[in-house]
Each structure stands twice: as structure tokens, then as C-alpha cells.
Amino acid sequence: MEKTRLQALLRGSEADAFVRAAARFALGEMKTALPAMERLLRPHDDAKWTVVTYLSFLWRPEDHIFLKPEVTKDFASRVQHPLEHQYDAELRLDVYESLLDLAKQIRHNFADLQPCDMIDIQSVIWVVGDYRDGREEPQE
């Protein structure tokens, strides 16, 4: 996680507001919580998908997924999902909703393997999105 700058936020006066916004996001109030998190993160140069999606993914892995941009865009491209073209580094709800749609499709396509939650779905994205011909070790 974007630890160095995020520590300043989490140890500062707006820590509670950020955690509350992250909790609202995790509970499904994404339309209001996403802009609230962005407003709190922007002064720390941390208004990034990795930061915004991390806590909800940990707190509610049955509903939320972690957005690691490069590997996720690569995966979306490989499976020709609209997220390939919809992705934007700006924190827009339609981007996250597209990611959730991609996750839903993965869950459906892997139903016979009985994925437990989005942690399993994230693993599929990571392994496939990180795959490169001829490379034996995963990229860090």
C-alpha cells in the first residue's frame, strides 16, 4: 500500500473522516464515499485506486475488489472487457463499477472452481494479468 504518505493522513486530524468514508464505501455508499475519500486523499497525493479500494477489499472481500491498475488493465485487455477502455486514474465511480462487472464475469466463468470471494477473483486477475511469455517469475 502507498504507506509513506498515507501514514500522514491516518495519523492526522482527518484520519477518522477518512476511515468513516472508507467504511461507507465498503457498505455500499460508494456514490458519496468515493468523492469524500478523494477530497481527503488529494492533499497527500494519495487519491489513487490502490488506496481507495484497499480497505473495502479487506473489510468486505465478498463485495469489493482491490484495483491494482496495470495488472487489471492488462487482464481486461486480454479478456476484452470494457474496463480496458473505461479505466481512468481519476477516481470515477463508473470505473469501479466496471471493475465490479469484470469481477462478476470472472466469478461466473470460474463458478465450477467455487471462488469464495473477491480475494479469489483478484488472484485470477493478478495471475493472468501479470503473465508474460518466457518469464518464469512473477513481476513484483
Describe the function of each predicted region.
Residues 36-42, 46-75:
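Catalytic DNA-binding helix-loop module of base-excision-repair DNA glycosylases/AP lyases
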